[in-house]
């Protein structure tokens, strides 16, 4: 049986634990309310305290990450760095890579246009692409070399002009129609080759294609333009990269 002094200490410790639990819960709600008041279009997915710091990592439903004080009065948009024995470690980049890696693992090859590696597969890269993008075409010309090096290229659709061409959402953009026509073709690889080489493809929109889902996924990944290469690790490599340089980055 605890003596009165020990009972008092235990009670005090329990009260402190309850206080901090409530404080952490209320911090997330406080941050959510602050976001809603300042920018209603910014919706909080979750808020997690940065280990040992009076700072919260705020993940939005869009996939973007902010940092906030517990009272929700100050927000920082950008990367958070941790100074340690490794130098300056980009905490935000690591967090984003981890999120993208989980999403990449859930992708289905049947929903993409896949150019399989020749011989032993040494790596897989996922590329958000648009038919009307000059650097996307330049990267596509590197695909045979990438395949020779043992790298499988999996294309996801990212129409830079968006899906709809009008406010009433009744007309599709040209880039959307071209990409969907590739996905609806019986031979997606040949259709992609033709579209990349000429910029033209016979219109075929009579199928269920994941174009809009890919566009949404790209936004969650932080894609801001095309091409955008996502490695198996979740790392995002924006823009064009020559085949041999990409292989070197992959350790091949």
Where is each model-derived feature located?
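A short beta-strand-turn-helix
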Residues: 105-123
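Bacterial N-terminal signal peptides that target proteins for export
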Residues: 1-9
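Extracytoplasmic/secreted envelope proteins and their assembly/folding machinery
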Residues: 28, 32, 140-143, 176-179, ...
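Bacterial N-terminal signal peptides
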Residues: 9-18
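Short, non-transmembrane alpha-helical segments in secretory-pathway proteins
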Residues: 23-43
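Extended, non-globular interaction scaffolds
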Residues: 93-96
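Structural alpha/beta surface segment adjacent to cysteine/selenocysteine redox centers
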Residues: 121-206, 219-224, 252
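Thiol/selenol-based redox catalytic cores and closely related redox-interacting motifs
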Residues: 41-48, 54-60, 64-67, 71-88, ...
